[in-house]
UniProtKB/Swiss-Prot annotation:
It comes from Campylobacter jejuni subsp. doylei (strain ATCC BAA-1458 / RM4099 / 269.97). GO terms for molecular function: structural constituent of ribosome. This is Large ribosomal subunit protein bL33. Belongs to the bacterial ribosomal protein bL33 family. It holds the Pfam family Ribosomal_L33. Signal peptide: none annotated. The keyword Translocase does not apply. One of its GO terms (biological process) is translation. HAMAP family: Ribosomal_bL33. InterPro entries: Ribosomal_bL33 (IPR001705), Ribosomal_bL33_CS (IPR018264), Ribosomal_bL33_sf (IPR038584), Ribosomal_zn-bd (IPR011332). Transmembrane segments: none annotated.
Length: 52
């Protein structure tokens, strides 16, 4: 089953991206290096649940 998750910047705390994840295949939390527009640099973004 696919669930919608947000990607939250670890440095500034903003949720900059949203994506879908297959919770059956990917059981651990996503952690990706993405661009943060507030800091204007690439930072690590961790998965957070979005309100549906």
């Amino acid at each position: 089953m696919r669930i919608k998750v947000g990607l939250k910047c670890e440095e500034c705390g903003d949720i900059n991206y949203s994506t879908y994840k297959n919770s059956k295949n990917t059981t651990e939390k996503l952690e990706l290096k993405k661009y943060c527009p507030r800091l204007k640099k690439h930072t690590f973004h961790k998965e957070v649940k979005l309100k549906s």
